[in-house]
Amino acid sequence: MKKPPLYKSLYAQVIVAIIIGVLLGHFLPETGTAMKPLGDGFIKLIKMIIAPVIFCTVVIGIAGMEDMKKVGKTGGLALLYFEVMSTVALLVGLIIVNVLQPGAGMNVDVSTLDTASLASYTAPGKLETVTEFAMHIIPMSMIDAFAKGDVLQVLLVSVLFGFALQKLGGRGTLVFDFIEKISHVLFTIVGFIMRAAPVGAFGAMAFTIGKYGISSLLSLGKLMGAFYLTCLFFIFVVLGIVTRLHGFSIWKFVKYIKEELLIVLGTSSSESVLPRMIAKMENMGAKKSVVGLVIPTGYSFNLDGTAIYLTMAAVFIAQATNTPMSLMQQVTLLAVLLLTSKGAAGITGSGFIVLAATLSAVGHVPVAGLALILGIDRFMSEARALTNTIGNGVATLVVAKWVGDLDMDKLHAELDNESPQAADQPEKILDQTNTKLGA
């Protein structure tokens, strides 16, 4: 099969768009800042389609299964994997920030920090209890879940609908067929939206550089360097070991989703590629029922990059302000972050909000210290989002293999394929999926 010209590749288009965005933001900062609506518009287009894509994917996957116990097993194993990997990510961040000590020697006086810009992040009530978090998953109505676009609420509605449709058996065939046809339409729309990805990446990058400036990276470069290094370590060592144990290569996997990663790099949001990741995971041999459960759930429960960021940023602030933290205090911070990190959906800036809420709740680290990293948080969000995206993809394949729903031959064939089919036309996935409604 002949490869398309390089200029037609989404991969190349996004790279060029990001470079142009950086140059515009650097040399014409006011113009670059004015490009913000382009990035925001692309993210809004993606969010517009996420809820119905999740609904159709989950419903088709569950309703097409004959063994309902397997759905429960898949969900349970996915949550187990999420908790283990989130804990590992938090520990990796905690260990490396203590070893490298990027904040040591800064000797920042907390009283001199400008905290006016932190008001919107440190408002009371930002931190949810476990009960509040569980209650939040239940929408006021089925329509409300889709209107808000809350991923976990949509997932709950989708799972219940899928179970009910499967229970109907043959009587639900017409509904099942209708939802499957809607899926074709939705993934076609995703294909249309993704053609605008270079424009969105350009706008978001031009705004970021124009507003914050490349020079702002230098002042806190030690923290950024340590954070990016830790993310790379987690991806290629920790996740590398996980993928090797499950029969595939992390290097080939990252290469396979390179276009998605570039879009994430440009937009700083892992949510921007959720529909494409669903398509790619199915094309790699994971069954729709597994993909539909693991990918959306992972956007709240499996944010490895955000977990690394939270521990590193908290301890960095303590180091920079000469705030001593005992081992027990760091363990307490870790325990609290295991809960609060679940509230950081894959949206730009959510990690900073969770960090502010956590520091307010724990009390060991001065919340005013957040002013130190507010200016560079936007630049660290790229690494967070990239790590989150890769982590969720790996989680999907691992859980699929655990429950016997991963075609290893297809996985290796796709990873060895230089031009993956799902790259530009994710709707083709549906043509390859002949799902039948369970009796």
From Swiss-Prot:
One of the record's GO cellular component terms: plasma membrane
Compartments, record wording: Cell inner membrane
PROSITE patterns tied to this protein: NA_DICARBOXYL_SYMP_1, NA_DICARBOXYL_SYMP_2
Sequence segments annotated as region (Disordered): 417-439
Membrane protein topology class: Multi-pass membrane protein
Keywords: Cell inner membrane, Cell membrane, Membrane, Symport, Transmembrane, Transmembrane helix, Transport
NCBIfam families for this protein: PRK01663.1, PRK13027.1
Name of the protein in its database record: C4-dicarboxylate transport protein
The gene coding this protein: dctA
